[in-house]
Swiss-Prot record:
Coiled coil: none annotated. The gene is ccmE. It comes from the Bacteria. The lineage of its organism: Bacteria, Pseudomonadati, Pseudomonadota, Gammaproteobacteria, Pseudomonadales. The chain crosses the membrane at residues 9-29. SUPFAM superfamilies: Heme chaperone CcmE (SSF82093). This is Cytochrome c-type biogenesis protein CcmE. It comes from Pseudomonas putida (strain GB-1).
Length: 151
């Protein structure tokens, strides 16, 4: 093999290795940023992975919101009218958060089956419902109406 071909071969191999490393980094970054949606039934059945960031959504059960008197800790229960899952959150809840409303919480499921949320999103008007929550409610046989849901 002459020196010109050897140089060209090393250049091509180097480029292929570089592209492979770049694709590997891109796939790794994308995989870490995927937050799959799980219903309370799926979480209660153990289908949601533990200690992996997920989105959990449903309707906030009436009478389930418990606020700590000395911190920003909040505990509430979310349901899809089949099963319910407790969610804990430390922070200020959105102004539109209330019992009987649809929410989506981003966080991790711990070993006790509790979603430890680091972000809570509430629907922003009486007609809007997160698509995942609406679909989950339809699958459970409940009407996905605005305002309060009736079990």
């Amino acid at each position: 093999m002459n020196p010109q071909r050897k140089k060209r071969l090393l250049l091509i191999v180097g480029l292929l290795v570089g592209v492979g490393v770049a694709v590997g980094f891109a796939l790794s970054a994308l995989q870490q940023n995927i937050n799959l949606f799980y219903t309370p039934t799926q979480i209660a059945n153990g289908e949601a992975p533990l200690d992996t960031r997920i989105r959990a959504g449903g309707m906030v059960e009436k009478g389930s919101v418990q606020r700590s008197s000395d911190s920003l800790d909040v505990r509430f229960v979310v349901t899809d009218f089949n099963k319910s899952v407790p969610i804990t959150y430390r922070g200020i809840l959105p102004d539109l958060f209330r019992e009987g409303q649809g929410i989506v919480a981003l966080g991790k499921v711990n070993a006790d089956g509790v979603v430890v949320a680091d972000e809570v999103l509430a629907k922003h008007d009486e007609k809007y419902m997160p698509p995942e929550v609406s679909k989950a409610l339809k699958e459970s046989g409940q009407a996905a109406t605005g305002g309060e849901a009736k079990p």
